[in-house]
Amino acid sequence: MEEDTGALPRKENFSEWYNDILWRAEIMDVRYPVKGLYVWYPHGFGIRKRAYGVLRDLMDRDHAETMFPLLIPKTEFMKEAEHIKGFEDEVYWVTHGGRNELDVPLALRPTSETAIYPMYALWIRSHTDLPLRLYQVVNTFRYETKHTRPLIRLREITSFKEAHTVHATREEAAAQVETAIALYREFYDTLRVPVILSRRPAWDKFPGADYTIAADTIMPDGKTLQIGTVHMLGDHFSRTYAITYEDANGEQQYAYQTCYGISERSIAAVVSVHGDDKGLVLPPEVAPLEVVIVPIIVGKRRDEVLASAAALEAELRGAGFAVKLDARDMRPGAKYYHWEMRGVPLRVEVGPRDIDANTVVAVARTGKKTTLDRRGVVEGITSVLAEFGEDLSQAARQAMAARITAAETLEETAEAVKSGVAVVHWCGSQECAEKIEAAVDASIIGSDIRSDLIAVSDGPCVACGGEGTSALVARTY
């Protein structure tokens, strides 16, 4: 990769900052010659790999990973009318094999319900087959007609983790929804990204679902980014695809289902929430490199310093850290710039003075310096990284809290959504939602709010004055 030495735009100019950091920090290359399709740089893919490693570890507790085909026959795809209505304008169709027109067109999956559920109907026979919890990490395709943006709005979603579960009763499926919500909370806690959970309005739920719970974070420009969804499907799809089981009494019953997904928007959230004017700031849990060692070479002690740095690298690698010794023939300042841009959580400096004092200097990506005893360096670095991670969590929570405003009038709501999320009272009607949205140029994104940063209450609807409860209003990506 060509070395970047330019200045990153200030993060307060978020759109420009975001576009620049994707290539300066080597996350994604946007120059692929198809709109809405992008290429992961190795460094960006390393972040994705570690983040999805966390996600897979969480999923593997009680889900099994699988893989379904990319192509879906039109005959299966068109079976669930409400579901198809939500996706029909976004589907890519394969109509030819070579020069031959296909008898049945094939859809490139926009999501996999219509690929997976016909197979579930074959696999599930008895109540002893339930619950069934499977997931896959795949690419999906949607013909986005809106402005595409790397990691945020794509025509090829390269990292779609979708889970599909089947249960004997509605109550068990509803309990699985709560389990999925808890899992997503744990995932984003690990990424140090604060989220607000809420129930999407009926007109904005997943097509074919009874209801949808979504996880949103607030971006630096005040817009919300949906970074996870959990859908209660009820028995809609099981009736369409004949997913039945024999209960303990020998009777045939329709199953109940859930599905839930996360995409590379999770990486966009990490980039946007934690990054600063110097570049990426990566939580240790998702950083491809946790520690970079920079030798400070002065005078005639070059070989001694490099040997000491190499010994430190070997010790840290042996202790399980993702570590790299940067022994390139460059000024230390140029190395600092390089690794700060890429978000490495911790830089360790080793120079002649440190060797003489039997110490090393650890510099967190936040700029905080700590002198560590060389003899206890593994424990010291473990402690510094843990503190760094907690600092990221607290800073992200404080930034989110500052972007949440309670509003009692449409005027206050309009002002609040310019820089963040407004919490208003809403009666739940679509008519009032449309009035609010037209007045403030933002959307009702959810009610039944779950966040310790928001005090939920009842009060008069901001649009009609009738009985209402807390709801979120925001500009969205």
From Swiss-Prot:
Cited HAMAP family: Pro_tRNA_synth_type3
Recorded family membership: Belongs to the class-II aminoacyl-tRNA synthetase family. ProS type 3 subfamily.
Subcellular location: Cytoplasm
Matches recorded under Pfam families: HGTP_anticodon, ProRS-C_1, tRNA-synt_2b
Protein's recorded name: Proline--tRNA ligase
Function: Catalyzes the attachment of proline to tRNA(Pro) in a two-step reaction: proline is first activated by ATP to form Pro-AMP and then transferred to the acceptor end of tRNA(Pro).
Catalytic reaction(s) noted: tRNA(Pro) + L-proline + ATP = L-prolyl-tRNA(Pro) + AMP + diphosphate
CDD domains for this protein: ProRS_core_arch_euk
GO cellular component terms listed in the entry, alphabetical order: aminoacyl-tRNA synthetase multienzyme complex; cytoplasm
Complex and partners: Homodimer.
Database matches in PANTHER family: BIFUNCTIONAL GLUTAMATE_PROLINE--TRNA LIGASE, PROLYL-TRNA SYNTHETASE
InterPro entries given in the database record: aa-tRNA-synt_IIb, aa-tRNA-synth_II, aa-tRNA-synth_II/BPL/LPL, Anticodon-bd, Anticodon-bd_dom_sf, Pro-tRNA-ligase_IIa, Pro-tRNA-ligase_IIa_arc-type, Pro-tRNA_ligase_II_C
